[in-house]
Amino acid sequence: MAPRRVRSFLRGLPALLLLLLFLGPWPAASHGGKYSREKNQPKPSPKRESGEEFRMEKLNQLWEKAQRLHLPPVRLAELHADLKIQERDELAWKKLKLDGLDEDGEKEARLIRNLNVILAKYGLDGKKDARQVTSNSLSGTQEDGLDDPRLEKLWHKAKTSGKFSGEELDKLWREFLHHKEKVHEYNVLLETLSRTEEIHENVISPSDLSDIKGSVLHSRHTELKEKLRSINQGLDRLRRVSHQGYSTEAEFEEPRVIDLWDLAQSANLTDKELEAFREELKHFEAKIEKHNHYQKQLEIAHEKLRHAESVGDGERVSRSREKHALLEGRTKELGYTVKKHLQDLSGRISRARHNEL
């Protein structure tokens, strides 16, 4: 009798209510269950878990992969800044696309190239032999090597010349690492463009291919030429400094700023514009130095945290984690600010050079 009453009762219920009934038991609302008030209300500021660092899911996946690879904290902070820049540029591109812009697909192609560089730079491209290029700041040691016999020879000559103090050798080593990174990015870009052209040749008809090579591919090769020019200028500078030592009248010390200043001097800028750019570069270099300081502090905090965890001091671990998290957040913020400023300065110089052409 009882089962018959139950069946009769169930037939009288609406379909949706039946579905909810059979999905039970329901978690209590106070625990944030699936159907609690908290879960159904919009969340204006969701908690940033490891998988919620970015608005774009593919970038979250890359971030999670990097964490699984246990990259050093400074490298992770650098990657975070690179992914933030990538996300900003991709979201801006989506707005352009909605407005019917980027018809030739060049901006989209540049975004893909930039992402490929990031993947290769941090060893996230799935290649077992991926060379993780160190950033300009701290993580590269002299034991890492420079991957180029010419650079190795120059560096050995500089070290044994007696022309450099310990501080100057550290500065010169950062310049060598910066050059190594530029070469690596050039090679990644070259490989990406080679794959792109192969795809076009295999898929697109010859008539369509001629139009593409006349616009998109041409601009991509222009980018390659600019990077190669920068590499050659950098190598000339390394040769000069390695043989002569540092000049007491040097304008700048940070490798990225030196590159920008060299490009600015050969760009189509008036004396007034060049002087204004020089002043802006001074502020930019100060910003980089501040970022480098926080990177050093983050490395120290990371070592202290590892030591505290190894001895099992709970209170000390708690304090160390708090300081580590604070420095990590600040390093990420400054890294993004530096990269954003660098992108802006590089773009302005590039446009000035194109206007000259």
Swiss-Prot record:
It comes from the Eukaryota. The modification Phosphothreonine is found at T248. Residues 1-34 form the signal peptide. This is Alpha-2-macroglobulin receptor-associated protein. N-glycosylated. It comes from Homo sapiens. Glycans are attached at N268. GO terms for molecular function: amyloid-beta binding; heparin binding; lipase binding; low-density lipoprotein particle receptor binding; receptor antagonist activity; receptor ligand activity; signaling receptor binding; very-low-density lipoprotein particle receptor binding. Residues 219-310 form a coiled coil. Residues 32-52 are annotated as: Disordered. It is linked to Myopia 23, autosomal recessive: A refractive error of the eye, in which parallel rays from a distant object come to focus in front of the retina, vision being better for near objects than for far. Keywords: Coiled coil, Endoplasmic reticulum, Endosome, Glycoprotein, Golgi apparatus, Heparin-binding, Phosphoprotein, Signal. SUPFAM superfamilies: RAP domain-like. Molecular chaperone for LDL receptor-related proteins that may regulate their ligand binding activity along the secretory pathway. One of its GO terms (biological process) is signal transduction. The gene is LRPAP1. PANTHER family: ALPHA-2-MACROGLOBULIN RECEPTOR-ASSOCIATED PROTEIN. Its main location: endoplasmic reticulum. Pfam families: Alpha-2-MRAP_C, Alpha-2-MRAP_N. The modification Phosphoserine is found at S50, S135. Interacts with the LRP1/alpha-2-macroglobulin receptor heavy and light chains; the interaction is transient and coincides with a reduction of ligand binding by the receptor. Interacts with LRP2/glycoprotein 330. Interacts with LRP1B; binding is followed by internalization and degradation. Interacts with LDLR. Interacts with SORL1. Interacts with LRP1; this interaction is followed by rapid internalization. It is found in: Rough endoplasmic reticulum lumen; Endoplasmic reticulum-Golgi intermediate compartment lumen; Golgi apparatus, cis-Golgi network; Golgi apparatus lumen.
